[in-house]
């Protein structure tokens, strides 16, 4: 039997419990998970790509089949590089789907061997986004139920306690 590999792409600026929910569930279904940290040219990052990677690595340290990578380029090229045929995209709400469908269609056109699977974030996390967490953190509110501990600490340092 061949080893199953999946890619979970995102900017992860920063990683949240919504992301962790998807990662943990995917890790139970695939042999290898490759988290691909992408630089979003449309967004100014709060954390550098290297900082985001470190926060993800600290957050997924207990999940043995997860690797964290940085990649600048086409996602389907990254999939080829790691030998993955599956991209996993998390959806919080139906409103996420239209954008995701356009990405999926383009990826399929670029590499017909790569499939995209969608997973709904668990209801407990469906309202969490990196942007909202950062906004709340700027006002010194408690974000411990939205992000892993290393991220909470990093956001407090970034925005002052």
Curated annotation (Swiss-Prot):
What is catalyzed by this enzyme? (R)-4'-phosphopantetheine + ATP + H(+) = 3'-dephospho-CoA + diphosphate
Question: What pathway is this protein a component of?
Answer: Cofactor biosynthesis; coenzyme A biosynthesis; CoA from (R)-pantothenate: step 4/5
Protein location: Cytoplasm
The record lists ATP as bound by 11-12, 19, 90-92, 100, 125-131
Taxonomy-wise, where does this protein's organism fall, top ranks first?
Bacteria, Bacillati, Bacillota, Bacilli, Bacillales
Q: What is this protein called?
A: Phosphopantetheine adenylyltransferase
The protein's Enzyme Commission number: 2.7.7.3
Q: Which UniProt keywords apply?
A: ATP-binding, Coenzyme A biosynthesis, Cytoplasm, Magnesium, Nucleotide-binding, Nucleotidyltransferase, Transferase
Q: What does this protein do?
A: Reversibly transfers an adenylyl group from ATP to 4'-phosphopantetheine, yielding dephospho-CoA (dPCoA) and pyrophosphate.
Primary residence: cytoplasm
* Top-level lineage group: Bacteria
Q: Where is the signal peptide?
A: none
* GO BP, sorted A to Z: coenzyme A biosynthetic process
- Organism of origin: Staphylococcus carnosus (strain TM300)
Q: Which family does it belong to?
A: Belongs to the bacterial CoaD family.
**Cofactor(s), names only, from the UniProt record:** Mg(2+)
Annotated substrate binding lies at 11, 43, 75, 89
Q: Which CDD domains match?
A: PPAT (cd02163)
Keyword Phosphoprotein carried by entry: no
**InterPro entries given for it?**
Cyt_trans-like, PPAT, Rossmann-like_a/b/a_fold
